[in-house]
């Protein structure tokens, strides 16, 4: 495992890289108030893949959000695209936990040509039942 750094439009984005550099590309996105190290326990299970786990701006070893910006959800999407571009990855599998999963889902919807697949852990997603069952399920809950 090695530390990596990318120059995004809003600042320096730090991260960790591990696995097989010749393997399928996977960009790992952590949850709110977390960092790239949260993916270290998964490293042995992903050894055949080229994993880059980033610290989103304002988290871990990455830069703070610069003046004039805030922690807007959409801005992190641009940061993720900056990292994919810096890596030279036209496409990648996205692995997201919590906030990272929500970001991965929105990126897949907005830029599907960049996303090979999604693996989401405790993330937002569509309910696994028909929409007309939603009211009854909420009442039951």
What are these regions (language model features)?
Residues 1-26, 47-50, 89-90, 116, ...:
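Alpha/beta-hydrolase fold catalytic core
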Residues 6-9, 16, 53-95, 99:
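Active-site loop/oxyanion-hole signature of alpha/beta-hydrolase fold enzymes
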Residues 14-64:
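Conserved HGGG/HGGXW glycine-rich cap/lid loop of the alpha/beta-hydrolase fold
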Residues 26-29, 52, 94-95, 104-109:
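A generic "structured core" feature
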Residues 34, 58, 101, 125-126:
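Active-site micro-motifs of SAM-dependent methyltransferase domains
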Residues 46, 111-112:
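Active-site catalytic pocket residues across diverse enzymes, especially alpha/beta-hydrolases
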Residues 105-110, 116-141:
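Flexible "cap/lid" loop of the alpha/beta hydrolase fold
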């Amino acid at each position: 495992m090695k530390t990596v750094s990318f120059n995004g439009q809003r600042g320096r984005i730090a991260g960790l890289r591990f696995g097989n550099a010749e393997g399928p590309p996977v960009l790992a996105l952590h949850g709110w108030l977390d960092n790239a190290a949260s993916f270290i326990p998964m490293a042995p299970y992903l050894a055949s893949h080229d994993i880059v786990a980033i610290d989103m701006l304002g988290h871990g070893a990455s830069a703070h959000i610069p003046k004039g910006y805030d922690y807007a959800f959409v801005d992190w999407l641009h940061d993720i695209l900056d990292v994919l571009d810096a890596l030279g990855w036209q496409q990648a599998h996205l692995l997201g936990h919590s906030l990272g999963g929500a970001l991965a889902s929105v990126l897949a919807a907005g830029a599907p040509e960049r996303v090979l697949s999604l693996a989401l852990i405790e993330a937002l997603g569509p309910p696994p039942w028909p929409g007309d069952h939603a009211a009854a399920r909420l009442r039951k809950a």
